[in-house]
Amino acid sequence: MIERNWNELIRPEKPQIETGADATRKARIVAEPLERGFGVTLGNALRRVLLSSLQGAAVTAIQIDGVVHEFSSLEGVREDVVDIVLNIKQLAVRMHAEGPKRMTLRATGPGPVTAGQIETPADIEILNPDHVLCTLDDGASVRMEFTVNNGKGYVPADRNRPEDAPIGLIAVDALYSPVKRVAYRVEPTRQGQSLDYDKLILEVETNGAVTPVDAVAYAARILQDQLQIFITFEEPKAKSADESKPELPFNPALLKKVDELELSVRSANCLKNDNIVYIGDLIQKTEAEMLRTPNFGRKSLNEIKEVLAGMGLHLGMDVPNWPPENIEDLAKKFEDQI
């Protein structure tokens, strides 16, 4: 059965999400348990896709009144144009439409000029409005125009310069990815009595254009889409729930272990010492047999009778074909009914 290649691998539970004060920018995502080696496999693949392949928006070109090239300086502006361009590269932008789009900045000194002073169209958001672009002296003023586009990955300035670029247009390196940092580590984790499994811990930081949780989801979807072409066979038809579960000649609740019942420590220890593991073992005992169990008294008997009554069961029941040979496998198959 080819499906055993993937069906018999352990699958992680729903990821645990840990966020700090700003859940829109930083999060730790934990997935466990994973088969040995899958922590590095998945962590490395997700990290590479997160940093390289998510769509975002960035400034691709600027024009500053009175500036012909990026090695100029502006009277009354403390930073030179090279520093201003570096500051502009750190703008965090979210676009709700296809680009390119234009933004404008007009400012008068004295004081710092921040990203929040940029005039944007309705479909553009500035996500770090307190970010300082430059500082003006008293009486100085500045006017800039920005071209914003959407894309993925890193695009160098020379590819952002149009062939018919006007004099004074400064092309900017564009880093479109909304993901600023990704780190992962793999730790051993327990599954049952075994420590031979992986726990993947992803730490993701974004610029706020997308949440870390959504960024990981998009990266996983990209990987899913790219890997799909390698699946060259038809999936075996999944069995329905009724087909996959055998008929039981007894109540599935009998497959529940007695240590899962809310019993006192004394009662639980008595059952354990008498090798009573499943409820199916317990209900076949009579009251007299239970009272002959060492340290088992009338109080424990009444406690167990009350718990069984709540399940529609009682002591002294006859259960044909108990215990079944594959009792542990049956308990897993019917755990949703136990």
UniProtKB/Swiss-Prot annotation:
InterPro entries: DNA-dir_RNA_pol_insert, DNA-dir_RNA_pol_RpoA/D/Rpb3, DNA-dir_RpoA, RBP11-like, RNAP_asu_C, RNApol_insert_sf. Its EC number is 2.7.7.6. One of its GO terms (molecular function) is protein dimerization activity. Residues 250-338 are annotated as: Alpha C-terminal domain (alpha-CTD). Coiled coil: none annotated. Gene3D superfamilies: 5' to 3' exonuclease, C-terminal subdomain, DNA-directed RNA polymerase, insert domain, RNA polymerase, RBP11-like subunit. GO terms for cellular component: cytoplasm; DNA-directed RNA polymerase complex. Pfam families: RNA_pol_A_bac, RNA_pol_A_CTD, RNA_pol_L. It comes from the Bacteria. GO terms for biological process: DNA-templated transcription. Keywords: DNA-directed RNA polymerase, Nucleotidyltransferase, Transcription, Transferase. It catalyses: RNA(n) + a ribonucleoside 5'-triphosphate = RNA(n+1) + diphosphate. DNA-dependent RNA polymerase catalyzes the transcription of DNA into RNA using the four ribonucleoside triphosphates as substrates. The N-terminal domain is essential for RNAP assembly and basal transcription, whereas the C-terminal domain is involved in interaction with transcriptional regulators and with upstream promoter elements. Homodimer. The RNAP catalytic core consists of 2 alpha, 1 beta, 1 beta' and 1 omega subunit. When a sigma factor is associated with the core the holoenzyme is formed, which can initiate transcription. NCBIfam families: PRK05182.1-2, PRK05182.2-5, rpoA. This is DNA-directed RNA polymerase subunit alpha. It comes from Caulobacter vibrioides (strain NA1000 / CB15N). The lineage of its organism: Bacteria, Pseudomonadati, Pseudomonadota, Alphaproteobacteria, Caulobacterales.
